[in-house]
Amino acid sequence: MAVFTKKSPHFNYKVPKPVVANPIVAKPTKPTITTPKVAIIGSGVSGLTCAYYLKDSHAVTMFESNDYLGGHVNTLDVTVTERSPFKNPFKPSTEKVAIDTGFIVFNERTYPNFIRLLDELNVPFQKAEMSFSVKNTYINFEYNGHTLNSLFSQRRHVLSPRFWQFVQQILRFNRETKSLLANFRQADKMQQAALSQQTLGDYLDSHDYGELFKTNYLVPMVSAIWSMGMDDAKRFPLLFFAQFFDNHGLLDVVNRPQWFTLVGGSKQYVNALITRLVAAGTTLYINTPVQSVRRGKDGVSIEFIHQGKRQTQVFDDVVFACHADVARRLLADITETESAILGAFEYTDNEAVLHTDTQVLPKKLLTWASWNYAIDKPTARVADQKPILTYHMNILERLTAKHNYLVTLNTPINEAHVIKRVDYRHPVYDKKMTDAQKRWHEISAKRHTHFCGAYWFNGFHEDGVKSGLRVCQSLGVDIDILLTTNTTAATTAAQIKRLSKPSKPSAKFTVSKLPSHADKKLSVVQRRQVT
């Protein structure tokens, strides 16, 4: 329950430590009596982007209902203390690591606006391995598509005609999807919309793809990327899917983009943003849920609860940088158009568990990947089930640690291994949603009201930045929104060269050096906690 302002001794905010209440409220240094006042509801990447690029021209106030700033940027500082019965049992060893549980990775090809932001903040990052595995315990089937060796981690697959057909269908699907995109571009010129109406499931069913390919490769990959169940993945708009996979190099065996993680965790860029915002006189509320928003002729009235007291403030404009359904609920004078568009966005809840239990990973160490998808029931019984997905943070963040630090979605974890549980909400991508995305201009920059969030595009961090920049442009900020084209490639490459840090752990890290036998004897582990 705190306000962060320039004179507050607590402005150097570190996610997610508690904050001392009743700090000193500072008067902004730059805003004057004529400076427009803007309220931003939500402190995820879109809200923070808005605040950062508006801070020099607007008096910015940010409202966050959570006890930390950053939204899906949620880096946990973890301490694991253990004693060894073979060394000095009275002198426990302690390991401290920073683990991301929400936003983790970005790449050189499709994140130009986010990389530009990191460059302005001077926040370093490091190369990350992006690999994907599937473990289907019901049919004793697993693979990791990163290398030929890991693809055939179950050696019997070398002599399996069914597995070779599975591989062949992956290559066939990649070719046909590229042709599909070319056909769509031609059809679009001729104003034929038939292709844009198809779902991924419709396409797979009509093109004679095998069940092994559908349920153990493509649908799990879509399910994992967008944190949705298999049924929802099949309802995914085909064109939306094809464009995303093509842009991210997922239809190519080679020429895929390089992925990165932030050195020290994603909180590093959030902390850098917060420091600059407070220095500019921005007011940042946490533990402060907004209750209602009402628009008038000359501005916006926002009612909120801070430190247990209901308060009201008036602003010139409001930016909804929260989920669409939250914005819909908060608008006390919502219009029919706003209600229809915002109501088209649906969400699903996913519980993320940070833990050290390797039982959720594939059986073979060779199959362990950055992203590990698990299927533990017959296909018919997992169709409407939320995705069971494990991020191996040692691989993603190049951790040379004593323990395997894992973030798993939607499956029970042995409590002895659990470090922290975090709840996230993700948008459900369907035709209704993609249609609503095209209507943003009908409700944003109207009646002193603006909307941003990654859900207006593909749902990723770059989309959050891009969406925030779009609102900044509406509010008069002169800034370009970079597109993923050759015109920005040289600039992005120069930024990557400046910020990419080849750390020693990154250079020495290999999957074979993972602590595969760690955490087997839980009795020696005294404490797993978030500090």
Predicted features and spans:
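Helical element adjacent to the flavin cofactor pocket in flavoenzyme catalytic cores
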Residues: 243-309
